[in-house]
């Protein structure tokens, strides 16, 4: 059996890891993107303006990682959204649909006790590299 190729994806246009993990890992055509918070990559600080601005920055960071892997948001097939307050769910949805416009990825959303650096939101994703064709059932 031939081995699959595993490659670390990294870009300076998204925040560096704040622990022992990679921004993303590509295995074959599947990209596993680590959770992104609303951290400005140049300052290393959370953006101000509450959960909406943090969500925008987290998704912008994710977009840069996707771009580094030769992808965009249309390649994303699954996301997990972690919220410090589940009452922010509707606000986050309004931001989320600015980045995911159709053929939405599968998703789970959870309220958690705390997030890194006091963030209000963290989003992780799985994407498939290369062209994708949407089939109708």
UniProtKB/Swiss-Prot annotation:
Homotrimer. Interacts with YTHDF2. It holds the Pfam family Ribonuc_L-PSP. The modification N-acetylserine is found at residue 2. It comes from Homo sapiens (Human). It catalyses: 2-iminobutanoate + H2O = 2-oxobutanoate + NH4(+); 2-iminopropanoate + H2O = pyruvate + NH4(+). Keywords: Acetylation, Cytoplasm, Hydrolase, Lipid metabolism, Mitochondrion, Nucleus, Peroxisome, Phosphoprotein, RNA-binding. GO terms for biological process: L-threonine catabolic process to glycine; lipid metabolic process; mRNA catabolic process; mRNA destabilization; negative regulation of translation. GO terms for molecular function: 2-iminobutanoate deaminase activity; 2-iminopropanoate deaminase activity; deaminase activity; mRNA binding; RNA binding; RNA endonuclease activity, producing 3'-phosphomonoesters. The modification Phosphoserine is found at residue 136. It is an enzyme of class 3 (hydrolase). This is 2-iminobutanoate/2-iminopropanoate deaminase. Its EC number is 3.5.99.10.
């Amino acid at each position: 059996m031939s081995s699959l190729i595993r490659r670390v994806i990294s870009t300076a246009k998204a925040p560096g890891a704040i622990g022992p993990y990679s921004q993303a890992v590509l295995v074959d055509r599947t990209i596993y993107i680590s959770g992104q918070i609303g951290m400005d990559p140049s300052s290393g600080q959370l953006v101000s303006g509450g959960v909406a601005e943090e969500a925008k920055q987290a998704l912008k960071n994710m977009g840069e990682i996707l771009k580094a892997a030769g992808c965009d948001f249309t390649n994303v097939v699954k996301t997990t959204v972690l919220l410090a307050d589940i009452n922010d769910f509707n606000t986050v949805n309004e931001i989320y649909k600015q980045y995911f416009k159709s053929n939405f990825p599968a998703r789970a959303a959870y309220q958690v006790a705390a997030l890194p650096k006091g963030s209000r939101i963290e989003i992780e994703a799985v994407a498939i590299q290369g062209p994708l064709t949407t089939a109708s059932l």
